[in-house]
A protein has these predicted regions:
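Active-site-proximal cap/loop segments of hydrolase catalytic domains
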Residues: 1-120
């Protein structure tokens, strides 16, 4: 695949099976890939997750992270999403931070999240 998001039909079939957003969409609709109705026990459960992004990212639009967080917080059953955190830097670019101070802050958030998840 030359570019993520390529509309090639065969590649889309593969991507759809691995995309957390697409998997969540199927669960929300209650329909499995084989067309059978899903039960609550069949549904995908989200791990604890932290999304970081930048408003000024010129390669991956922050709308992708926003859309996933919205789906997790508003569309998924609460018991399926144990922890969902979101941080968007209004300055940085594709790397998420505009300077070392912002980069340090972003990494501090990341390490604090990992410490929480790992029980440290």
């Amino acid at each position: 695949m030359a570019e993520y998001g390529d509309p090639d039909t065969e590649e889309w079939k593969f991507l759809r099976q691995h995309s957390p957003y697409q998997l969540l969409r199927h669960d929300r609709l209650g329909i499995a890939e084989d067309g059978k109705e899903m039960t609550a026990d069949d549904m995908w459960t989200c791990p604890k997750v932290l999304f970081t992004t930048s408003t000024r990212d010129d390669r991956v639009h922050p709308g992708h992270a926003r859309k996933m967080v919205k789906a997790l917080l508003e569309d998924a059953p609460a018991e399926k999403v144990p922890l969902c955190l979101y941080w968007e830097n209004t300055e940085g670019g594709h790397g998420g931070a505009a300077d070392n101070k912002q980069r340090a802050y972003m990494w501090a958030l990341t390490y604090a999240f990992l410490a929480e998840v790992l029980g440290l």
